C-alpha cells in the first residue's frame, strides 16, 4: 500500500475526509443516523411552489421500515436503535435524523415542539450534556442519542430558525442538511427543484455564519449535465462553508416523473455503471476541498424501487471498499488537485 502523504494525517489513515472519522472526533466513537418521519410535507408538492415535486423524488425508497409518521418520535427512535443494532452492530451512539421531505416546513413554534422530543431523549440519560430541567421527557430514555440532524430545502430556513438552533447547539449537537442536488440552475429547473443555486448558497452561508454544522446533498448524472460539468462543480462546492457532503449517483425510481421521461427518452440519460462511477467520483474527490467531510460517495436503495439497473445489488460498504481500493491503486486522495491559495493542509 502506498503511504498516505504526511500532510494528510488528519484523514486518519484513509484517503478521504470520512464521516466516521468526523464523528469519532466529535463523540469518541462510531455514530449512526436514525431516520425519523415526523409527518412533514414539502412546498414543492403541496402547491406553495409546485404540485409535482422534484422529478427524481421518491422518499419511500430511503425510508427504513420502522420510519412511519403515525409512530411517535419516541417509538421511531426506539425501533431505529434496534434496527441498526441488528444490521450493523458497530455504532454505540446515534443521531436522530429528521429525513423524509422538508423538516423545517412548519411554523417555528411547531418545529420547536417536534425537535425537542428528540432533544429530551438526549437529556434524559446522556452524560455528555447538562440536563434541561425545563422539559419533561416524552421520547426514548436512552444515553445513546447524541444529537439531531435536520434534512430540508435551502429555501426553508430563515434567521429566526437559525437563531433558535444556534441556542440549542450550545447544549446539543445539531446539523442542518440541505438538498442542493446541482450547482447548475438549468438542471434545477429541469428537475423541477423549485429553487436556484443562489438560494442554496445563501442558506449554506447563513447556517455557517451561525456556527451550525451544515451538510449538502448532490446527485451525479442528472439529465443535461456532462461529465465535465459535474467535475467542475467540485470547484464551486469547495468554496462553500460546508461541513459535510453526500453524493448520490442518479437512480431512476419507479413512480416518479423522471421514470416516465427515462422510459420515453432513455437517450436523455447517462446512468453510470459501477466501474465508471468509481473513477468519476475519485476524479471529483481529487478536486474537492479536503476540509469537507464526505458522508457518502454513492446512494443505496432496495432494487425493488428502481427502474434503472442496480449495481449488482452491492451494499454501500462494498462500493466504498472498491472506491478506497481504487484510490490506493491510483495513489490519490481527496483534495490532491484542490487549489486554494488560502488553504493550508
Q: What would you call each of these model-derived segments?
A:
Residues 1-53, 59-92:
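N-terminal [4Fe-4S]-dependent radical SAM core
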Residues 1-21, 27-32, 244, 252-345:
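Auxiliary Fe-S-binding modules of radical SAM enzymes
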Residues 60-80, 87-108, 143-157, 173-199, ...:
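Core AdoMet radical
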Residues 85-87, 118-122, 163-173, 205-209:
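Acidic (Asp/Glu)-rich catalytic clusters
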Residues 108-116, 158-167, 230:
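Distinct, well-ordered alpha-helical segments
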Residues 128, 132-141, 344:
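A cross-taxon signal for low-complexity, glycine/charged-rich
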Residues 198-258, 275-298:
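Conserved C-terminal portion of the radical SAM core fold
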